[in-house]
Amino acid sequence: MQPRFDPAWIVRMTDDYVVVDKPAGVATQPEEKGLRCDLTSLLRAYLRERGEPDGIGVHQRLDRETSGLLLFSRTRKASVPIAHAFEARAVEKEYVAGVVGDPGPDRVLRHRLGERMHGLVRVDPKGKDAVTELRVLARRGDRALVALRPHTGRTHQLRVQLADVGAPIAGDPLYGAHPASRMLLHATRLVVPYAGGELRFESRLPPEFERFLEGEEAVDVTDRAAFAACLERALHRRGALFSPPEGTPLTDAFRLFHRHGDGAPEIAIDRYGDYAVLHAYEEEGALELDAVIASLASLGFRGGYLKRRRRETEKPAAAVHEALAPEAPVFGEAAPFELEIHEHGIAYPVRLGDGLSTGIFLDQRENRRRLFQVSPGRSVLNLFAYCGAFTVAAVEGGAEHTLTVDAARPAIERARGSVLGRNPAGEHRFLVEDVFALLPRLARRGERFDHVVVDPPTHARTKKHRFHSGKDWVGLAAACAGLVSPGGSLWASTNDHRMDPRGFERFLRRGIEEAGRGVIGRKVFGPPIDFPQVPGLPPHQKTVVLTIA
């Protein structure tokens, strides 16, 4: 399952150089010190396995989501002329992009691009020249394939230029707004002056480009080859989780495939140690999952479970419940009833065959780590706590006082067992309560907490209260703010796809103001890397941490 170099990626290899057809999803070089999941590191490992020298020279790079040709030198004899050719801009490079909108006639695009800020490059009249030849290869409706020959090498140059002329690259999570099975940009041609002649390399266009032109917006999950390729890209995107820097505490539970963000909106796949959970989001009838299950089973999991998620079924009867979330695995062997998984070295219990939920929300992994880091000696209120994973993180971090609240008794009993089974020092309470009714009572009793964590469902209903994410956050934030100790923090999180982070923060600040409190610090976090953003939409999960005066 761990990403490895595939020899099929090699276009040509000699004693002096190697040309690789990089797949989408793989970084060219390490993005963080100690990581070994990028193409350069994987290629070096492959050469060592062959008993060959692993020294390679890197002369160019492609964005992680761009596929195509990369040339590496293997000897100093080759490195010097290849490096000189790239530095002198004597190398001819050609790309093909799948775009949505009218790219216009064949022409030269001329822009000035500013410096990269907050991950984005923008057109800036005071920026540096960006020049690209554009040639239209094919058009079908509002879609087109275009060939691009850049004459300059600015960061994100092709992506920004195409977006600016009204034809953004499909699947581009930063500059596009149109879904696709991946970002449709491929380096197809490379011509390098070398040894008195030239090296010429070409790469065939991946099949998803033609499928895009024919109207595809997501991978067909019944096509085993297409889905397997899509899943492989998703695994490479998560290379940092499979191969973290040496000495990193163990994390063996995370999302392997995230719906639209990885190219198939009907499918999500989670890893729980040696087991997998497949989520099928079904709008109309049951999905045909044979190809997905076969691809998943080939990864080497001991077993895999299925959760069918249907919008129209909120509280299914027992028979329907078993059909949606079978207790038995759909392949392999059954997991223990209570399985121990790990995040950043902390153990959490989960139940893979016990209904639609497992006992932990994996998209909150990094927020649990953050809470762990600020918990020593502190008090923590965990609202809408489910099975208490945030409380576990706080207690493991050294919190001395916690209160864990949820309306579901089974969830609270699981939280109690998970927390108290660690024999923590301090006082740790658990309440089966309607959060909305409890908050005023806590305020009247004068209870205060250093950290208040609130992560409600997008829609919640109790006997006396209804909550709908949006403006209802104002009242909830006001009630929570009154329970935060001066200098403490409100940790608010939502997976409401309708709200962007700024709108979410505005609701929170209005609530805090209504409570007569002020904000003296803020941090905003998006989802972790295994929950990639959907092009054109806000991140699905948003967390705002506000320090309150």
Residue ranges of predicted features:
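Mobile active-site "lid"/loop adjacent to the S-adenosyl-L-methionine
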Residues: 411, 432, 449-479, 485
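Non-catalytic accessory regions of SAM-dependent methyltransferases
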Residues: 183, 205-275
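RNA pseudouridine synthases
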Residues: 1-219
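Conserved SAM-binding motif I beta-strand of class I
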Residues: 401-406
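Conserved SAM-binding loop of SAM-dependent methyltransferases across substrates and taxa
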Residues: 387-399
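S-adenosyl-L-methionine
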Residues: 410-451
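Non-catalytic substrate-recognition/targeting regions of SAM-dependent transferases
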Residues: 259-263, 270, 286-361, 369
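C-terminal catalytic and target-recognition region of SAM-dependent MTase-like enzymes
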Residues: 489-549
